[in-house]
């Protein structure tokens, strides 16, 4: 933290996270997304895959984490979260979570500070908070969210988006 009780993140950390987020990264995991059961009702699925930096290094704390949960409500979008993590911080994310949202209490001086932002959303770092500021996105297909995320995260070599295998017609 910048000050003992300031609540502000360390500016050096914010700068480092932004620098890594802006670098070109290479997908070094498998040639397809590997989903694992995350439990819940309806059942959710998660995927976590490593990335390499331009120098070839693969920091253990640099990865893409995805979460998918089919909607249990007809006409309500499925839940999808696509996140870039570095040093245990969510530095960039695209989230779709149906008819929900939050008020941006961080991001002073940014366009959506103090405003309610529904889903879908783009999460980025602010000077006053590493996570917690979101801007609205246009609704799109899950595949397009993935393509958009991979593009803005600067990730090359990522596999195409594939949903986890669901047991259609059976309760999950």
Spans of features found by a protein language model:
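Charge-rich, low-complexity N-terminal segments
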Residues: 1-63
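Broad, structure-driven detector of short, well-ordered beta-strand segments within folded domains
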Residues: 58-73, 92-95
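Intrinsically disordered, low-complexity segments enriched in small/polar residues
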Residues: 1, 5, 37-38, 42, ...
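Short coil-to-beta strand junction motifs in C2/discoidin
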Residues: 74-79
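Intrinsically disordered, low-complexity, charge-dense segments enriched in Lys/Arg
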Residues: 113-172
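Intrinsically disordered, low-complexity, compositionally biased regions/tails
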Residues: 43-44, 48, 60, 102-105, ...
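Residue-level recognition of well-ordered beta-strand positions that form the cores
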Residues: 50, 65-67, 83-85
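An exposed acidic His-Trp-rich patch
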Residues: 80-136
């Amino acid at each position: 933290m910048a000050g003992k009780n300031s609540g502000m993140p360390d500016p050096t950390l914010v700068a480092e996270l932004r620098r890594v987020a802006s670098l070109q990264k290479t997908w070094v995991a498998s040639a397809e997304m590997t989903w694992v059961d995350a439990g819940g009702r309806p059942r959710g699925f998660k995927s976590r895959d490593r990335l390499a930096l331009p120098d070839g290094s693969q920091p253990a704390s640099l990865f893409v984490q995805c979460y998918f949960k089919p909607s249990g409500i007809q006409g309500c979008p499925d839940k999808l979260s696509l996140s870039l993590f570095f040093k245990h911080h969510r530095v960039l994310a695209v989230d779709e979570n149906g008819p929900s949202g939050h008020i941006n209490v961080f991001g002073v001086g940014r366009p959506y500070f103090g405003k309610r932002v529904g889903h879908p959303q783009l999460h980025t770092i602010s000077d006053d908070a590493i996570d917690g500021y979101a801007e609205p996105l246009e609704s799109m297909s899950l595949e397009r969210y993935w393509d958009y995320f991979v593009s803005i995260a600067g990730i090359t070599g990522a596999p195409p988006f594939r949903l986890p295998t669901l047991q259609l017609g059976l309760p999950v």
